[in-house]
């Protein structure tokens, strides 16, 4: 069964190109290490909710957009191996993220349906 790392972040609108550069560099490594796919999505239409929403979940500021991303793996074992490589990687450690990592939300998911 496929595994997915999911992420939601608030990125300053002005940092779109810097974000894309860091995302490309990270994606290259994740794919080399065994990930099946890396997807990065830049906010187009993220409405405010009545109770909660993406913007509140990451305490997005007025000048920030929501980025919704995921990394797919063929199975849990591959995901765990990739995570180990990520933690040990000097390249990942040296990457500067163009957003506040403290407000990043993430989780690991088992694919339930993929049609």
Regions found by a protein language model. Name each.
Residues 3, 14, 22, 63-66, ...:
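Generic preference for well-ordered secondary structure
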Residues 3, 7, 19, 30, ...:
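Aromatic side chains
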Residues 4-11, 50-86:
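Short, well-ordered beta-strand segments in beta-rich or mixed alpha/beta enzyme
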Residues 18-31, 66-70:
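Generic detector of contiguous secondary-structure segments
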Residues 31, 35-62, 88-115:
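Glycine-rich beta-strand-turn "strand-cap" elements at beta-sheet edges
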């Amino acid at each position: 069964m496929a595994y997915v790392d999911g992420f939601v972040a608030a990125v300053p609108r002005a940092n779109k190109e810097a974000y894309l550069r860091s995302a490309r560099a990270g994606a290259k490594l994740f794919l080399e290490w065994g990930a099946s796919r890396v997807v990065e999505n830049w906010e187009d239409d993220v409405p405010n909710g009545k109770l909660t929403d993406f913007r509140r979940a990451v305490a997005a500021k007025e000048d920030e957009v929501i980025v919704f991303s995921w990394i797919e793996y063929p199975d849990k074992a591959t995901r765990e191996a990739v995570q180990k490589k990520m933690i040990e990687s000097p390249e990942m450690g040296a990457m500067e993220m163009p957003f506040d990592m403290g407000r990043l939300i993430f989780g690991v998911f088992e694919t339930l349906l993929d049609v």
